[in-house]
UniProtKB/Swiss-Prot annotation:
Catalytic activity from the UniProt record: 3-deoxy-alpha-D-manno-oct-2-ulosonate + CTP = CMP-3-deoxy-beta-D-manno-octulosonate + diphosphate
Organism: Mannheimia succiniciproducens (strain KCTC 0769BP / MBEL55E)
Gene label: kdsB
One Pfam family from the record: CTP_transf_3
Described function: Activates KDO (a required 8-carbon sugar) for incorporation into bacterial lipopolysaccharide in Gram-negative bacteria.
Protein name, entry field: 3-deoxy-manno-octulosonate cytidylyltransferase
Length: 259
């Protein structure tokens, strides 16, 4: 069993759903559901990183560990770097980053991504699932990932990759409908969970943001831009919806109300 620390960034001032870490789901704040899933993963330590006193109080009330961070970070990775520095986490320690809006994340994939990092000797590891619906393929909020034959990432994009020249031309001409598109096993959706060594997180934030990450608004592209490898494997369990919008929140509430 691989030892790892989970850090959960929980930003209070979400643009689409302000205050969402404290949104009530089945009688508990959302961040507590994420915390409980992380604890079930076998992590040796779980830390919530937040810039908000109310979130801090909620987590501590449930016996969780909190690290207060600046409200001025531009990304979740910058928040992680502050936690690593503040808590003096050793450079070789494995950090798993779980988003604070994933109350339904399966614990098994949290440990899986840590194992993936160790198994392939890379600086960063993540997970993906197969895309079976054409609507998801063309949805820019569903990030696509393209890998080589061994699972090393070639690129992440909000666009459909690889681009099926002939089939997509038929789509544009009206000869083919989206629902008739044969997706086979060519398309993968990236899951926003990462594992890295603490020292690599500190290295990452020293790099200047890349043109590609700014165009796509995907911070993981910075890693590829600077020549580092990311390994992705298929998740052992497909995670349910995360909470980005009020509609997502209602879906999650409906799911957890049955438990």
């Amino acid at each position: 069993m691989t030892n790892f620390t989970v850090i959960i960034p929980a930003r209070f001032a979400s643009s689409r759903l302000p205050g969402k870490p404290l949104a009530d789901i089945a009688g508990k704040p959302m961040i507590i559901h994420v915390l409980e899933k992380a604890r079930l993963s076998g992590a040796t330590r779980v830390v919530v990183a937040t810039d908000n006193e109310e979130v801090k109080q909620a987590v501590e009330q449930f016996g969780g560990e909190v690290c207060m961070t600046s409200a001025k970070h531009n990304s979740g990775t910058e928040r992680l770097a502050e936690v690593v520095e503040t808590l003096n986490i050793p450079d070789d320690e494995i950090i798993v980053n779980i988003q604070g809006d994933e109350p339904l994340i399966p614990p098994v994939i949290v440990s899986q991504v840590a194992e993936n990092l160790c198994k392939f000797k890379v600086n960063m590891a993540s997970l993906a699932v197969k895309i079976h619906e054409s609507a998801e393929l063309f949805n820019p909020n569903a990030v696509k990932v393209l890998t080589d034959k061994d699972g090393y990432v070639l690129y992440f994009s909000r666009a459909p990759i690889p681009w099926n020249r002939d089939a997509f031309a038929r789509l544009n001409s009206g000869e083919l409908k989206q629902e008739e598109l044969d997706l086979a096993d060519h398309y993968l959706r990236h899951i926003g969970i990462y594992a890295y060594r603490a020292g690599f997180i500190k290295q990452y934030v020293q790099w200047e943001p890349s043109a590609l990450e700014q165009i796509e608004s995907l911070e993981q592209l910075r890693v590829l831009w600077y020549g580092e490898k990311i390994h992705v494997e298929l998740a052992k369990e497909i995670p349910a919806v995360g909470v980005d919008t009020a509609e997502d929140l209602e879906k999650v509430r409906a799911i957890l109300s049955n438990f």
